[in-house]
Amino acid sequence: MPPKQQLSKAAKAAAALAGGKKSKKKWSKKSMKDRAQHAVILDQEKYDRILKEVPTYRYVSVSVLVDRLKIGGSLARIALRHLEKEGIIKPISKHSKQAIYTRATASE
């Protein structure tokens, strides 16, 4: 085999820029999910909406109120306790982590 031919500095630099290597992998290309902007203070409009809509729901829980009414979780828990005290909804299952309610029927 003949000896390897020595390249000049300019030739070496041109070879380095020629881009023979693959670019580094980017770990995250996903778009970030927008942060929810739910209400944390109950105004009269939200209160009226809760009193009007929630009695029509068949299944009522904190997550249902957060999803449908765009209110915070602590506000939803307070609203559920208030509606239960008023007799508008009745509990199905209650424990420290999750409370599930249904609408109260007139016969009960």
UniProtKB/Swiss-Prot annotation:
<keyword id="KW-0687">Ribonucleoprotein</keyword>
<dbReference type="GO" id="GO:0005829">
    <property type="term" value="C:cytosol"/>
</dbReference>
<keyword id="KW-0963">Cytoplasm</keyword>
<feature type="compositionally biased region" description="Basic residues">
    <location>
        <begin position="21"/>
        <end position="30"/>
    </location>
</feature>
<feature type="compositionally biased region" description="Low complexity">
    <location>
        <begin position="1"/>
        <end position="20"/>
    </location>
</feature>
<feature type="modified residue" description="N,N-dimethylproline; by NTM1">
    <location>
        <position position="2"/>
    </location>
</feature>
<comment type="similarity">
    <text>Belongs to the eukaryotic ribosomal protein eS25 family.</text>
</comment>
<comment type="function">
    <text>Component of the ribosome, a large ribonucleoprotein complex responsible for the synthesis of proteins in the cell. The small ribosomal subunit (SSU) binds messenger RNAs (mRNAs) and translates the encoded message by selecting cognate aminoacyl-transfer RNA (tRNA) molecules. The large subunit (LSU) contains the ribosomal catalytic site termed the peptidyl transferase center (PTC), which catalyzes the formation of peptide bonds, thereby polymerizing the amino acids delivered by tRNAs into a polypeptide chain.</text>
</comment>
<protein>
    <recommendedName>
        <fullName>Small ribosomal subunit protein eS25A</fullName>
    </recommendedName>
</protein>
<dbReference type="InterPro" id="IPR004977">
    <property type="entry name" value="Ribosomal_eS25"/>
</dbReference>
<feature type="region of interest" description="Disordered">
    <location>
        <begin position="1"/>
        <end position="30"/>
    </location>
</feature>
<keyword id="KW-0488">Methylation</keyword>
<dbReference type="Pfam" id="PF03297">
    <property type="entry name" value="Ribosomal_S25"/>
</dbReference>
<dbReference type="GO" id="GO:0022627">
    <property type="term" value="C:cytosolic small ribosomal subunit"/>
</dbReference>
<dbReference type="GO" id="GO:0002181">
    <property type="term" value="P:cytoplasmic translation"/>
</dbReference>
<dbReference type="GO" id="GO:0003735">
    <property type="term" value="F:structural constituent of ribosome"/>
</dbReference>
<dbReference type="InterPro" id="IPR036390">
    <property type="entry name" value="WH_DNA-bd_sf"/>
</dbReference>
<comment type="subunit">
    <text>Component of the small ribosomal subunit (SSU). Mature yeast ribosomes consist of a small (40S) and a large (60S) subunit. The 40S small subunit contains 1 molecule of ribosomal RNA (18S rRNA) and 33 different proteins (encoded by 57 genes). The large 60S subunit contains 3 rRNA molecules (25S, 5.8S and 5S rRNA) and 46 different proteins (encoded by 81 genes).</text>
</comment>
<keyword id="KW-0689">Ribosomal protein</keyword>
